[in-house]
Regions:
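Positively charged, low-complexity terminal tracts
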Residues: 1-72
Length: 72
């Protein structure tokens, strides 16, 4: 089963790996459903993604700043 997604808006990137994958906060519609705030790691071309398991303190701080900004 293919999973379809539409990236509606990028709120911010809060971390990047040496291989170029980025940890991002986005507004995404999955399989045509209502868009939701989504936090995950993306490949440079956004063709692959992975859920986030752990964060450094610096990445957590940046994530917190993005979440505060988009919910104000």
């Amino acid at each position: 089963m293919d999973i379809e997604y539409e990236l509606i808006e990028t709120y911010g990137v809060f971390d990047e790996t040496e291989s170029g994958w980025t940890r991002e906060v986005n507004l995404i519609s999955w399989n045509g459903r209502e868009p939701k705030i989504d936090v995950r790691t993306w490949s440079p071309d956004h063709s692959k993604s992975a859920k986030i398991g752990t964060l450094s303190k610096d990445a957590a701080r940046k994530l917190g700043q993005i979440l505060v900004r988009i919910t104000e």
